Structures are given as C-alpha cells and as structure tokens.
Amino acid sequence: MTEQVLARGEEIFRLIPQRPPMVMVDVLYSADETGGRTGLTVSPANVFCINGFLAEPGLIEHSAQSAAAFAGYRYFLAGEDPHVGLIGEIKTFRIARTPKTGEKLKTNVNVIGEAMGMSLVETETFSGDEKIAGGQIKIFIV
C-alpha cells in the first residue's frame, strides 16, 4: 500500500525555511494536531554524508527539520510562511546506527508540549522497520 503524501520535493520549501544544501526532509507524509511523519532519502550529495553514511549531526538535523515541516504545514494551512525555528535543547537522543546513502528514512514527530513559542517534540527515525534514532528536541520558534 502506498503511503499518503502531503508534500514532496520542491513543495517542502513551502513548509520549512531551510534551502539546499541544508534541506534534510524531502517528503511530508502526514500531519495532524499531535504530530506528523516525514521522510528523507539519504543522498551522497547530502552535506552530512561522510564516506557513504549520514553522520550523527545529520540525523539530529533531520529530526529537527521533521518537526519544522510539521509546524510549517500548520502555518501553511493558516496561510502563513514557515517560521524559523532554533534547536534549544537535544535531550535523550539515541542513535543506534547511521544510515547508508540510498536508505529511505521515515521519522515520526510527536508533540509533547507547546508554550510561548517553544515546542518539545519526541522523534523516532526508522529505516524500514528498524528504529535507528530518536529522542526529545526542544525547538524555539522565532
């Protein structure tokens, strides 16, 4: 069964403020009031790829941009441009392994709480059925 797609490719630029070469999300599968699901195909041209693998900072940035894509979709529905978000804290983030180029990642974003321009999200990144990374990220929206 094919998964629903809300935005992909260039459409993502309506949802996140990042631009190449710093774009770490290439598809938004779903978004609702509690979270969303994004994807990234790891490309050898990715700035975080080293020796055929997406380095740890790339996985963290992908998770943060996944949260940004979810938030950006809400802004898009309200007729607004995406807002800039800054990583305020990375908490309990675990990386089981780094993915190889060509792997297709899917990341679930669950909003734990929001207040005064700050969002606390829990992310889980999968390659197929294997959870390869995840944790909590605090993001400040400016």
Where in the sequence are the language-model features?
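Polybasic, low-complexity association/targeting segments
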Residues: M1-A7
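Hydrophobic beta-strand-centered segment that forms part of the acyl-chain substrate-binding groove
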Residues: V5, A69-K106
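Short aromatic-glycine motifs in intrinsically disordered, low-complexity regions
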Residues: G9-R19
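Catalytic strand-loop segment that frames the active site of acyl-thioester-processing enzymes
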Residues: R19-A55
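Conserved positions in beta-strands of structured domains
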Residues: D26-Y29, K91, A96, N110-I112
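HotDog/MaoC-like acyl-thioester-processing domains
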Residues: R37, A69, K100-G102, K106, ...
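A conserved, well-ordered hydrophobic junction motif at loop->secondary-structure transitions
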Residues: T41-Y75
